[in-house]
């Protein structure tokens, strides 16, 4: 549809007449006929707004131009024959001619490189091969890949070898430095030496696997372990004694060890407790390794550690045992248990340390010992009569005091338990000096507990005014750690408390209603 504004042609007469009579042909409500009473209304004329001269000059059809502004290639067929916009050759602008034209009139075209002179001559003569279409010279030619602007660099030729060096060139030709020769010789010697060692070892291994001869290795020290035990046993034999407490109706027997040249002997409390409680009815005697019997006097005893100290007088040339350090004992160390089991004096049994810090409860008929010891566990046999004797290491030093033995039957085999010598030193020194010893206490009683929440010592009751009450420990708290020692049950709690220092703050960790709480408690001395 042509929408151009045509101002040159006159408006049709019928539209002019209709505009003039516009008021006459305007439809009214209820009027179904035209001005002449017809049945149809005449259409409203097309409204053409007035055009000012400036708009007509800017947007009007140019003078002498016919047809629409449609490009020729998309113009309808009826307009194809119009030649209004056919391009014609025109001279270029003088400025463009000067910039892009030939430099001089009549000059030849762009020159070729002299190398291509033959190709140019052949091209002029028509004898050369047909050149492909050049889109730079022929706009109608199709685009194609041509010769690259820069030729690929030619590969470098392989370096010519200088030839192999002979032995004469290497040694006397001066082409290899003497330093390099020395290094090569050293490397060759090292490689040769390593190869010789490997070859020798390989031959020995192969011979060992293939030979039919069997050789047993023997040395002059084949009896060294047995000899070592013999020397250790002999070194401590005279420092071990047998202790006998006898009344008119009964008697008890155990062992002891001499710890001081003045005649002080350490033994277990349960060995002499009956005699200590009834001194008028019992007589205590010490029997030395040579069979000499000497009466003994009680210096002091401690039921809470099951230790006691006796003293013999007027005995010369006593053999004092060497005391070791139980903190250096390790599981697997070889040990000897020395004593008088079943009344057999100077009996030695051998074993190893199988555990450390083993809480072992002690109690027995006829004894006031009711405590827990922090024992060294050993598989060396400790039987009735061994109690109070020393547990010896391979340096002939006392590392413990044999105290208890456990077995599945009445046989001699089983496990033995000894009080560590470091604890024995503290107790013995206090008993020798003061005749008694005090231990730390918290003022609570406990029972063992183990469940999904906690395992330890559950507080059964708390004594009024005790260190535990002052420190905030409550009933039903489960104590899981005392100081630096974990507590697994009530027996271990007893041992852990005994290792605290009286009057010094100690951390106590408890589980209270599922929560871990750390309290500070200052132990008091016990009353006994």
UniProtKB/Swiss-Prot annotation:
Example of a GO MF term: serine-type endopeptidase activity
Intracellular or extracellular location(s): Cell inner membrane
Keywords tagged on the record: Cell inner membrane, Cell membrane, Hydrolase, Membrane, Protease, Serine protease, Transmembrane, Transmembrane helix
Cite the InterPro entries for this sequence. Chloro_Bact_Ser_Proteases, PDZ, PDZ_sf, Peptidase_S1_PA, Peptidase_S1_PA_chymotrypsin, Peptidase_S1C
Gene Ontology cellular component list:
peptidoglycan-based cell wall; plasma membrane
Cite the EC number. Answer: 3.4.21.107
Residue stretches of biased makeup (Gly residues)? 31-40
The residue ranges of the PDZ domain are 426-487
Indicate yes or no for the key word Aminoacyl-tRNA synthetase. no
Taken from the record's topology, the Periplasmic segments are 200-528
Keyword Coiled coil (UniProt)? no
One GO biological-process annotation of the entry reads: proteolysis
- Active-site annotation: 270 (charge relay system), 306 (charge relay system), 387 (charge relay system)
Name the catalysed reactions: Acts on substrates that are at least partially unfolded. The cleavage site P1 residue is normally between a pair of hydrophobic residues, such as Val-|-Val
Please name the PANTHER family in this protein's record: PEPTIDASE S12, PROTEASE DO-LIKE 8, CHLOROPLASTIC
- Primary role: Essential protein that may act as a regulatory protease that is conditionally activated upon appropriate environmental triggers.
Per the similarity annotation, which family is this? Belongs to the peptidase S1C family.
Spell out the protein name for this chain.
Answer: Probable serine protease HtrA1
Q: Which species is the source of this protein?
A: Mycobacterium tuberculosis (strain ATCC 25618 / H37Rv)
Q: What is the lineage of its organism?
A: Bacteria, Bacillati, Actinomycetota, Actinomycetes, Mycobacteriales
């Amino acid at each position: 549809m042509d929408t151009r504004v045509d101002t040159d042609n006159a408006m049709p007469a019928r539209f002019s007449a209709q505009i003039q009579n516009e008021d006459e042909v305007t439809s009214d409500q209820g009027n179904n006929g035209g001005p002449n009473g017809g049945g149809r209304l005449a259409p409203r004329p097309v409204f053409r707004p007035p055009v000012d001269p400036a708009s007509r000059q800017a947007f009007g059809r140019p003078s002498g131009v016919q047809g629409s502004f449609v490009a020729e290639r998309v113009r309808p067929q009826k307009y194809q024959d119009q030649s209004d916009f056919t391009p014609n050759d025109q001279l270029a602008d003088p400025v463009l001619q000067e910039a892009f034209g030939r430099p001089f009139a009549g000059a030849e075209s762009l020159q070729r490189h002299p190398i291509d002179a033959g190709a140019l001559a052949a091209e002029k003569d028509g004898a050369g091969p047909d050149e492909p279409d050049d889109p730079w010279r022929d706009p109608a030619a199709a685009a194609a890949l041509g010769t690259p602007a820069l030729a690929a660099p030619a590969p470098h030729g392989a370096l010519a070898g200088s030839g192999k060096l002979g032995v004469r060139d290497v040694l006397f030709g001066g082409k290899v430095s003497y330093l390099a020769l020395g290094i090569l010789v050293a490397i060759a010697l090292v490689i040769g030496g390593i190869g010789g060692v490997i070859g020798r070892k390989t031959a020995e291994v192969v011979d060992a696997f293939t030979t039919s001869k069997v050789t047993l290795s023997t040395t002059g020290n084949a009896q060294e372990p047995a000899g070592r035990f013999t020397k250790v046993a002999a070194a401590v034999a005279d420092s071990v004694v047998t202790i006998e407490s006898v009344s008119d109706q009964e008697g008890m027997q155990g062992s002891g060890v001499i710890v001081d040249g003045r005649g002080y002997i350490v033994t277990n409390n349960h060995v002499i407790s009956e005699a200590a409680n009834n001194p008028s009815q019992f007589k205590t005697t010490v029997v030395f390794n040579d069979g000499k019997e000497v009466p003994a006097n009680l210096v002091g005893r401690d039921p809470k550690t099951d230790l006691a100290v006796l003293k013999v007088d007027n005995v010369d040339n006593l053999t004092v045992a060497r005391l070791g350090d139980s903190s250096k004992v390790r599981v697997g160390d070889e040990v000897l248990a020395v004593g008088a089991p079943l009344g057999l004096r100077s009996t030695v049994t051998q074993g190893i340390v199988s555990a450390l810090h083993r809480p072992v409860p002690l109690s027995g008929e006829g004894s006031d010992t009711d405590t827990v010891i922090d024992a060294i566990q050993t598989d060396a046999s400790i039987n009735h009569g061994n109690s109070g004797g020393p547990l010896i290491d391979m340096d002939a030093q006392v590392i413990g005091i044999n105290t208890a033995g456990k077995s599945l039957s009445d046989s001699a085999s089983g496990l033995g338990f000894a009080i560590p010598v470091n604890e024995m030193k503290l107790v013995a020194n206090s008993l020798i000096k003061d005749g008694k010893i005090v231990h730390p206490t918290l003022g609570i009683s406990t029972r063992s507990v183990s469940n999904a929440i906690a395992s330890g010592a559950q507080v059964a009751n708390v004594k009024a005014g005790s260190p535990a009450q002052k420190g905030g420990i409550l009933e039903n708290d489960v104590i899981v750690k005392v100081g630096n020692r974990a507590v697994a049950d009530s027996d271990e709690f007893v041992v852990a408390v005994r290792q605290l220092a009286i009057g010094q703050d100690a951390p106590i960790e408890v589980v209270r209603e599922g929560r871990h709480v750390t309290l500070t408690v200052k132990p008091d001395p016990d009353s006994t």
